[in-house]
Amino acid sequence: MIKIAKTLFILLAITTSIHAQSLQDLVDRAAKTTLERFADKKLQESELSITLIDLRDSKHPVTASFHGNERIYPASVVKLFYLVAAHHWLEDKKIEQTPELTRALRDMIVDSSNEATQYVVDVLTHTTAGYELPPKEMEEWQYQRNAVNRYFSSLGYTNINVNQKTFCEDAYGRERVSRGPNGENRNKLTTDATARLMMEIVTGKIANPARTAAMMELLKREYTGQSSDPDNQGLGFTGIALKGREGIRLWSKAGWTSTTRHDVAYVEMPDGGKFVLATFTSQHANEREIIPTVARVVIDGLKEVK
């Protein structure tokens, strides 16, 4: 029996290794295809990050990435981290589920509202914006503001910074001081960390079933139809690659600024395919086809990955 168990373990390890290499080949192909397509736009390797998690066997997820551990300003994708932190705080009764918090969480994720996010960060960290503080008080303020960082660090997340509000224009006062004179304390995420968090949401690892369902409801996207908003989260990012394909379901959180365009998506295919795909781009915010180009290669190639 021991020999049989060892043999099965070795076979499983070999199979997993082959699967991982096939998935890595797919991600590399997606990156190569995208870089070649947008070569005339001068898209560089350093401006593209991709992480793919194959969830067809949700108990044994397999991950592959391209520049997946590069720290990038995440824009509104950081709101996914604040959503998870809020549900953890609520579960631990650190904060109360008030009507205003419910409204803010919805607007933060569904509408990507920066004002709602500012309120959520205040609630999570017990810090507020305002005039500059004396050094000692600012140090205490910053410690409180790092509460979300400490939470994700306790879960094993590394190489990220999630302690800043999102703004339509600019930060002032203590918010600007916190960010740093050169932006050295800005929010930073990697596609590896972002894809991992989305995976832990959709598989129910990060929260109980009720809270998982609540988060998934906010992340659910429609990718058919039309919108007057070119930055519609369902129609303007990964969802572009899903048009004309029937039976697909999409959950996502996008983010964009004048220089960045990002999306993290969970996709369920009618053939049983399930995957998380995080794609971050820098310096090409107006190139709306970069993210769906990556997604098309992944969708078409995943069925070949065994």
Give the label of every model feature segment.
Residues I4-H67, L90-I95, M138, Q142, ...:
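N-terminal leader/targeting segments and the immediately adjacent pre-domain N-terminus
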Residues Q21-T34, K42-E47, R186, T190, ...:
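Structured C-terminal helix/loop/strand segments within mature extracytoplasmic catalytic/sensor domains
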Residues S49-L52, A75, D107, Y119, ...:
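Structural recognition of the beta-strand scaffold that forms the well-ordered cores
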Residues S22-T33, E45, E100-R179, N187-D192:
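Active-site-adjacent helix/loop patches that line small-molecule binding or acyl-intermediate pockets
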Residues Y73-I95, M108, L277:
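Active-site SXXK
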Residues I53-R56, I109-S112, V120-L124, Q164-T166, ...:
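Active-site-proximal beta-strand/loop segments in catalytic clefts of secreted hydrolases
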Residues V84-D92, D122, R196-T203, D300:
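Short glycine/serine- and small hydrophobic-enriched flexible loop segments
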Residues H88-R106, T117, N208-T212:
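Short, well-structured active-site flanking segments
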